[in-house]
Amino acid sequence: MYNLRNRSFLNLLDFTSKDIKYLLDLSIDLKKSKYAGIEVQKLKGKNIVIIFEKDSTRTRCAFEIAAYDQGANITYLGPKGNQIGVKESMKDTARVLGRMYDAIGFRGFSQETVECLANYSNVPVYNGLTDISHPTQILADLMTIKEHKGSLKGIKIVFCGDGRGNIANSLLKGCAIMGLDFRIFAPKELFPDSNLTLKAKSLALKSGGKITITDSKEEAVKCADVVYTDVWVSMGEESNWEDRINLLKLYQVNKELMCMAKDDAIFMHCLPAFHDLSTVVGRDIFDKYGLDGIEVTEEIFESKNSVVFDVAENRVHAIKAVMVSTLG
């Protein structure tokens, strides 16, 4: 049986198209098994710890449900529930937890931190998000595209917004490896790192994919099968709202933009999304700037084209596939 036993899941560039296809197929199979009530628990007796430097709803729940479904025990260490970096270094923490647990999940700031965990724990480590990478999210994204479009090859997907963020960067890697036609629609100031773009274009050349980085809406969005966006300001950057809005307001996903994509184009977002006035941030932005939504309008978020909650659910199945393939 093809598997990834004992491997960490830190960066999509560590994996081949065959590896990722295996994980996607396994994700879909695990989802079908759960819905049919015939899921086989392959992680009984396993212990998994998840370390979160950033609070989370979807990522924490996805890790916990994935573990519970497969019979594993899980421990959550939140931003205030441990001594990491205060009384004990991450290097020492990794060696301690590696003696107690079979795998470690991490959600935080630095990619170097999750790599330190992997280097010193001697158990599989799963990257639930860092400032530059979000590989489990992209697995869920690709799974969702495959479910709705039937295939990945040649699918045209456009990311609108900050081309330097962890979602755009991770999509760039994943789409290049898997042969999609990926475009980033962003202001020039927020284009992704040039070295990463060159790497992605090289991978796309081998996979039959295509990479386009542009500030032209027509070039990016025309005939797209998938339109994707993310929040314009990440946690801890709230003071930057005004600058970001001025820079990105022309890159909002709205009816005008969606009309340039295919009629059956799907809209995707990793969540949380600022699309209405029901959050403190959404109301504050509306009061200050009068925007109908921020990165996406309510009309598009709630439209029949929106698959954002399919993506959210698929986080569980994608993370479960990573756990099963590395520990099962």
From Swiss-Prot:
Protein's pathway: Amino-acid degradation; L-arginine degradation via ADI pathway; carbamoyl phosphate from L-arginine: step 2/2
Catalytic activity: carbamoyl phosphate + L-ornithine = L-citrulline + phosphate + H(+)
Cellular compartment(s): Cytoplasm
Alphabetical list of InterPro entries matching this protein: Asp/Orn_carbamoyltranf_P-bd (IPR006132), Asp/Orn_carbamoylTrfase (IPR006130), Asp/Orn_carbamoylTrfase_sf (IPR036901), Asp_carbamoyltransf_Asp/Orn-bd (IPR006131), Orn/put_carbamltrans (IPR002292), OTCase_ArgI (IPR024904)
Transmembrane segments: none
UniProt: carbamoyl phosphate binding residues: 56-59, 83, 107, 134-137, 270-271, 315
Annotated GO biological process: arginine biosynthetic process via ornithine; arginine catabolic process to ornithine; citrulline biosynthetic process
Entry keywords, A to Z: Arginine metabolism, Cytoplasm, Transferase
Binding site for L-ornithine: 166, 230, 234-235
Protein name according to UniProt: Ornithine carbamoyltransferase, catabolic
Organism: Borreliella afzelii
